[in-house]
């Protein structure tokens, strides 16, 4: 069990190095490998194949903390990588960012990435929700502010069109 945690940590660190080098596909591969090492160790998740094989000893609180930290970091880093790759898979960015936010609801980077994903998926209400939360945590971040402005603009445009549509229906 300790070995799997160490291997997962090593894969995560390799992924971080690949990310710094701009090798996003390689980084994604390393983060996925790290998560695979952790599969079945997380007591909060159901086992993929119940009642198969011996049940390992329970994780200590320290091991569980390490496991959750590695998982959260990997999901956050996966979202960052995917935003750098073409074509961007916004559904995955949203999914990974939300996994981070389940454990760390205040994580500014995950809030921002979720907002960006929802924006590009044209769910502007959700984008606004996440970007407002991100701007509250990082008020000086120009990217967060820019995406919040773009989202507000799209929402205003949508509401203007909606208003004109209803005026046309009842005129």
Curated annotation (Swiss-Prot):
Coiled coil (UniProt feature): none
UniProt-listed Gene3D superfamilies: Tetratricopeptide repeat domain
InterPro entries cross-referenced by the UniProt entry: AIP/AIPL1/TTC9 (IPR039663), TPR-like_helical_dom_sf (IPR011990), TPR_rpt (IPR019734)
Keywords associated with the record: Repeat, TPR repeat
Top-level taxon of the source organism: Eukaryota
TPR repeat placement: 8-41, 72-107, 108-141
Keyword Repeat tagged: yes
Family to which the UniProt record says this protein belongs: Belongs to the TTC9 family.
Protein name: Tetratricopeptide repeat protein 9C
């Amino acid at each position: 069990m300790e070995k799997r945690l160490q291997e997962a940590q090593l894969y995560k660190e390799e992924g971080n190095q690949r990310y710094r080098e701009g090798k996003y596909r390689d980084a994604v591969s390393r983060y996925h490998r790290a998560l695979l090492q952790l599969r079945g160790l997380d007591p909060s998740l159901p086992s993929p194949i119940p009642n198969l094989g011996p049940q390992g000893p329970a994780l200590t609180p320290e091991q569980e903390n390490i496991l959750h930290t590695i998982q959260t970091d990997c999901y956050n880093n996966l979202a960052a990588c995917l935003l750098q790759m073409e074509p961007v898979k916004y559904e995955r960015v949203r999914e990974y960012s939300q996994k981070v936010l389940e454990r760390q609801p205040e994580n500014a980077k995950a809030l921002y990435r979720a907002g960006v994903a929802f924006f590009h998926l044209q769910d502007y209400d959700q984008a606004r929700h996440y970007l407002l939360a991100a701007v509250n945590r990082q008020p000086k971040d120009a990217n967060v502010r820019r995406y919040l402005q773009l989202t507000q603009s799209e929402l205003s445009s949508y509401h203007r069109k909606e208003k004109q549509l209803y005026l046309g229906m009842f005129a």
